């Protein structure tokens, strides 16, 4: 299988849009819209009977877009809402349910290509390894998703299980970015577990959603909050999404990573975790927090008073949208230039965009089983992107 025409068009359109807005876009990097057509009867009855919020209470794509408008958010990274689907004991039924939820995300992105960045979701535990791998392939090659997530907490499996690492290998081999719920709400995602995942493909990005938050009790969450902050500084390929985490720790994360400079200052994006959090509340809070960070001389953090200009407009914009935009841009460029994409072009008899489809600098990445994966040259693609954007070849120079 190779990228379908739909996937190629989806990726190309998204890439063009993100390249045109990266210097001003505001992105919510963690949202979970659902299709009401997929709600179970029980969920439908509960929604009709109870207007109050309950954990994970689903919102439709249209509701999400309205909330984004209210909050001044241009785009959202969207994956399915695990609270809106029901698993059974039958892995095939679970595959069908999760497939349908991913299709709903793909269709939402098709309808709103300038608002929605679609991301996939797979689950090796509920689906079984083969079906979970099949879903990864559909997410990337059929629907053109740049990111595929697993949730070790809600789906209940250790983040560094062998089967999870094999799923990471598959996502990477397809050219996409693996993402994980990474929180202190369960014991399934310790910092060492995410480190194992990150070291599996050290030149490849991996996304840790919640940066150690995710809804633990405040005191219980403290050790992972601290460990996550340190982990990212030792693994430059980890990209963190700041959502569902104490605001005080989020502020410290932002100051720490801004002080650390590139690449770390480019490895964080802010988010709401809607519908688990409100977009308006979170982005209202982020904007207010950044206003105080901009006023470094008057800030309570001594690191800021010593570096009062640390949070200039460019720094704030990085965290509010550009960091994630650039991660998706790099990924989309890689997907369009992947061996799978080249295969599709040959099959369709299309001319190559240029003569450089060989990926001659692809890395050899050994896996536990001794098998080798050909992966596209990440650094090379970054260089291409920078040239395309009319700035220097150095990755750090890419950034405003
Ligand atoms: Zn989330």
What are these language model-derived features?
Residues 1-27, 38-75, 263-267, 277-348:
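Mid-to-C-terminal alpha-helical segments outside catalytic/metal-binding sites
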Residues 3-9, 84-186, 244:
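Active-site gating/metal-coordination segments in enzymes
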Residues 30, 68, 105, 148, ...:
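Conserved, mostly hydrophobic/aromatic
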Residues 30-36, 181, 210:
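Histidine-centered divalent metal-coordination motifs
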Residues 45-91, 115-123, 146-147, 153:
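Divalent metal-dependent hydrolysis catalytic cores, especially in the metallo-beta-lactamase
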Residues 341-400:
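Short, strongly patterned local motifs
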Residues 43-54, 85-97, 214-224, 280-285:
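Short, flexible/disordered intra-domain loops and linkers
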Residues 4-7, 145-147, 156-270, 274-279:
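Catalytic pocket-lining loop regions of alpha/beta-barrel enzymes
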